[in-house]
């Protein structure tokens, strides 16, 4: 069964513990369900496995979590929708295909509100003509996934100036509200619709 669970606003540690608990249960076969956890985080930086010291400039009093996902450092905060799929992928679905599907969820969501978004060669995430609107960083072990994707709705971009987001020096971060007026709860509903449609192809 595919379950969509809205955690509301969370501290990063809380959401990480939920993911890890379900992830371990799925690895052992104790949990046969598949989950998309949705949240907004209180301010936090997360640093993936390719983070270099020069990618973190000055995070001041905001915590930094070094975690086991792909990618470099990013910021999470209010005004950003974060989606954590904890899934058992169908046989033969590659990590590349899985990431493609997560990106597709975002591309189709923002297309509904008139934003043209796309992928870039050799980069993960979703981009627009005004900058990067969504980041992707995942871990897949024995076909089970964790971590995920974050979509910027109206997040405070100043926090991204304290890091080199995703290790990309020359592409700014952008919000949905750089293009159109947007209510985060309405965007979330559109996102969930595409999560259900695309997510069923993965499990």
Swiss-Prot record:
* GO cellular component, as recorded: cytoplasm
Q: Which UniProt keywords apply?
A: Acyltransferase, Cytoplasm, Transferase
Outline the extent of the BPL/LPL catalytic domain.
Answer: 30-203
Report TM segments. Answer: none
What GO annotations for molecular function exist for this entry?
A: lipoyl(octanoyl) transferase activity
Enzyme class of the recorded protein, top EC level: transferase
Cite the active-site annotation: 166 (acyl-thioester intermediate)
What biological-process GO terms show up in the record?
Answer: protein modification process
Q: Name one Pfam family in it.
A: LplA-B_cat
The answer to whether UniProt assigns keyword Repressor to this entry is: no
Other remarks on this protein: In the reaction, the free carboxyl group of octanoic acid is attached via an amide linkage to the epsilon-amino group of a specific lysine residue of lipoyl domains of lipoate-dependent enzymes.
Protein name (database record): Octanoyltransferase
**Species name for this entry?**
Persephonella marina (strain DSM 14350 / EX-H1)
